[in-house]
Amino acid sequence: MPCVQAQYSPSPPGSSYAAQTYSSEYTTEIMNPDYTKLTMDLGSTEITATATTSLPSISTFVEGYSSNYELKPSCVYQMQRPLIKVEEGRAPSYHHHHHHHHHHHHHHQQQHQQPSIPPASSPEDEVLPSTSMYFKQSPPSTPTTPAFPPQAGALWDEALPSAPGCIAPGPLLDPPMKAVPTVAGARFPLFHFKPSPPHPPAPSPAGGHHLGYDPTAAAALSLPLGAAAAAGSQAAALESHPYGLPLAKRAAPLAFPPLGLTPSPTASSLLGESPSLPSPPSRSSSSGEGTCAVCGDNAACQHYGVRTCEGCKGFFKRTVQKNAKYVCLANKNCPVDKRRRNRCQYCRFQKCLSVGMVKEVVRTDSLKGRRGRLPSKPKSPLQQEPSQPSPPSPPICMMNALVRALTDSTPRDLDYSRYCPTDQAAAGTDAEHVQQFYNLLTASIDVSRSWAEKIPGFTDLPKEDQTLLIESAFLELFVLRLSIRSNTAEDKFVFCNGLVLHRLQCLRGFGEWLDSIKDFSLNLQSLNLDIQALACLSALSMITERHGLKEPKRVEELCNKITSSLKDHQSKGQALEPTESKVLGALVELRKICTLGLQRIFYLKLEDLVSPPSIIDKLFLDTLPF
């Protein structure tokens, strides 16, 4: 039997029809080791005659081998003589569009040549070899795919159950290419179609093209050829539109190892999908792709070196641009997720840094946020002063100033040099503990004064009113700042100068007042107030109506501005929960605790172990409620 090597690509003029090579090359692949003879179910996809015009003519595989074949000394496959069984004695016609200048008689022969039919009484009809093909006549039908317009012509229907197998021509490419691994566990072969290169594609109303048969690296059929199997498989990796065709569920042991091909990017998306119209591959999220590294929310792309959501990106950018300083009300290990990311800005910013967000990438110059555009022309002095400022501007400026003032008054470094959680913490005389108590109160007064000067509008008040407000609220500010900074759950108290002391070290000086401060701190931290609410709480504890003010009206206006900024912060949805009622309730509790503080100072004065500083003595007398 002669060795035949058929190539399908554009052929030079004068060559025989069987030796022509077409632009679309054929390749096969053993998709599963359990298959030897595969039957193609082509009825589900309804491939029209136009979609199969690039297939080789049946005359290529007719029984007569005469002179239309070129004999090659070395062939890839040695096939048996194919037998083509045609229903009703008529084979479907194949119309191939020649894209090169071929002889006219070749084109005429392609449209009218009929394959030879073997005798019906031959024994080969009962058991067809593996290289035989069975064609069944089927009427034209309307294609389900809108990309393929309906055309009249013979259609391939499904293969009969009695047919042992249906194969496509094997990959007889020259020169051969290197075989690559196969797709493990694949259930469906992929048929790829691509536009014919010589003629521009004519798009259909649904966006389809005149397509040619082009199986690529992921599209192939199994070709069991018995003992004369090939040692490698070749494929032409071309971009194409995939349309899956199912294989018949007929299995038999293989006589040779399967041929492997490179998996197509769309192979995974076609498994389990409808073979007629596979959907495009979806983005895989198994490796965490598409989630924010900070809070776990949806994230489209990377920001500042890490895949983050828009909320965490904006939070990180604002924090770096404004050089904001945050304070954690808990143990600096607050959970940061989609639901609780706004509760603690300190822990959120620390997590941004821990996941790898780079502060140096944030633009802090005059072009920040403009995405590379040139700065606009400077406005004239008349244009820079708006005739009527927008209402939200003053509250927003007030809120930013309050937060900045609170963070600036927070100690940068903590001093653990005197921290002692053991029983030796109570060492020392009572006078030393009382003196320590007075020193801590005195240091808080200086911090409160520098903090108050950064509040917008406070320095516009009369000097007498400024002094009165600071001195009247010094105990409230002392308790509030101590409650915000301290980790009272572990009995660690952080004072305004950064000194960290254990509860046992403060108990002899503070007395029972220390337990009241601890309870207030735990309740305040349970409210989950953000830094904006804490800043407003600190300001409202000082700027309020006091007896002896010279201009109480101006103090009331400043208090209303702070309250408006808090309401504006809550109305814009920036606060996680309603905060105004919580802030007002915390103010009431703060006043009660300050009364206990006055009682403690009064008791120490009566004890007279240590003379109080003059500033403490004056403040005590001025803040008495009688």
Curated annotation (Swiss-Prot):
NR C4-type Zn finger ranges: 292-312, 328-352
Tissue: Isoform alpha is highly expressed in skeletal muscle. Isoform beta is highly expressed in skeletal muscle and low expressed in fetal brain and placenta.
Residues in NR LBD domain copies: 394-623
Residues covered by region (Interaction with NCOA1, NCOA2, NCOA3 and KAT2B): 1-291
Pro residues composition-biased segments: 140-149, 195-204
GO biological process: adult behavior; axon guidance; cellular respiration; cellular response to catecholamine stimulus; cellular response to corticotropin-releasing hormone stimulus; cellular response to leptin stimulus; common myeloid progenitor cell proliferation; dendritic cell apoptotic process
Compartment(s) of residence: Nucleus
Quaternary context: Interacts with SIX3 (via homeobox); differentially regulates the transcriptional activities of NR4A3. Interacts with the constituents of DNA-PK heterotrimer PRKDC, XRCC6 and XRCC5; phosphorylates and prevents NR4A3 ubiquitinylation and degradation. Interacts with NCOA2; potentiates the activity of the NR4A3. Interacts with NCOA1, NCOA3, MED1 and KAT2B. Interacts with EP300 and NCOA2; mediates the recruitment of MED1 in the coactivator complex.
Region (Interaction with KAT2B): 379-626
Biased composition range(s): Basic residues: 93-110
InterPro entries referenced in this protein's UniProt entry, alphabetically: NHR-like_dom_sf (IPR035500), NR4A1-3 (IPR003070), NR4A3 (IPR003072), Nucl_hrmn_rcpt_lig-bd (IPR000536), Nuclear_hrmn_rcpt (IPR001723), Znf_hrmn_rcpt (IPR001628), Znf_NHR/GATA (IPR013088)
Disease the record associates with this protein: Ewing sarcoma: A highly malignant, metastatic, primitive small round cell tumor of bone and soft tissue that affects children and adolescents. It belongs to the Ewing sarcoma family of tumors, a group of morphologically heterogeneous neoplasms that share the same cytogenetic features. They are considered neural tumors derived from cells of the neural crest. Ewing sarcoma represents the less differentiated form of the tumors.
Family statement: Belongs to the nuclear hormone receptor family. NR4 subfamily.
Ranges of biased composition (kind: Low complexity): 268-284, 377-387
Region annotated Disordered, chain positions: 92-152, 192-211, 265-284, 364-394
Lineage, highest ranks first: Eukaryota, Metazoa, Chordata, Craniata, Vertebrata
UniProt name for this protein: Nuclear receptor subfamily 4 group A member 3
Residue ranges: DNA binding: 289-364
Keyword terms: Chromosomal rearrangement, DNA-binding, Metal-binding, Nucleus, Proto-oncogene, Receptor, Transcription, Transcription regulation, Zinc, Zinc-finger
Disulfide linkage: none
Induction section of the entry: Induced by inflammatory stimuli in endothelial cells through an NF-kappa-B-dependent transactivation of the NR4A3 Promoter.
Purpose of the protein: Transcriptional activator that binds to regulatory elements in promoter regions in a cell- and response element (target)-specific manner. Induces gene expression by binding as monomers to the NR4A1 response element (NBRE) 5'-AAAAGGTCA-3' site and as homodimers to the Nur response element (NurRE) site in the promoter of their regulated target genes. Plays a role in the regulation of proliferation, survival and differentiation of many different cell types and also in metabolism and inflammation.
Entry note about domains: The AF-1 domain mediates transcription activation. The N-terminal region (1-292) directly interacts with the C-terminal LBD (380-627): the interaction is potentiated by AF-1-mediated recruitment of NCOA2.
